């Protein structure tokens, strides 16, 4: 996020920050029920992401680099949860909460495909593929984020 590869300790610290911000406020989860079941998941995600600012008004000053970093951490941490919940809602299944002991890709797969009655066995190949998808997506968004300010 700072234009260079992190040290091992910086990487570990970043991963912990992300893992500790994966949950959504329960009131945000209620927003999903306002969407039709056949709404496109991307439309749901856009609505939910927009609603986040009403819950995190403590860090909305885009002129403050620390606020931008906090917002970046939050959106990176919460986006898999938001996306998985949009998917679960669209297919009529109960939401599955994040499990922070899992890595980023595995957690996303878990939230998408586990159910309250059946644990999802994560396929290592799918996990690797999701990692490969998430890397360029997050890099692209972060680079766009950096150039806006």
Regions found by a protein language model. Name each.
Residues 1-33:
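An N-terminal structural lobe/cap that precedes and organizes the functional/catalytic core
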Residues 6, 25, 79-80, 144:
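Proline-rich low-complexity regions
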Residues 43-139:
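Glycine-rich, mobile lid/loop segments that gate access to catalytic sites or pores
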């Amino acid at each position: 996020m700072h234009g260079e590869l992190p040290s091992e300790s910086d990487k570990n610290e970043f991963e912990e920050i992300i893992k500790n911000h994966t949950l959504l406020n329960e009131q945000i989860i209620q927003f999903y029920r306002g969407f039709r079941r056949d709404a496109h998941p991307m439309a749901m995600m856009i609505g939910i992401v927009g609603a986040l600012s009403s819950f995190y008004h403590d860090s909305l000053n885009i002129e403050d680099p620390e606020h931008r970093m906090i917002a970046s951490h939050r959106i990176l941490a919460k986006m898999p949860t938001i996306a998985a919940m949009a998917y679960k809602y669209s297919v009529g299944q109960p939401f599955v909460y994040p499990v922070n002991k899992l890595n980023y890709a595995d957690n996303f797969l878990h939230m998408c495909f586990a159910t309250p009655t059946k644990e999802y066995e994560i396929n290592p190949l799918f996990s690797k593929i999701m990692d490969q998808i998430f890397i360029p997506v997050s890099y692209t968004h972060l680079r766009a984020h950096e150039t806006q300010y």
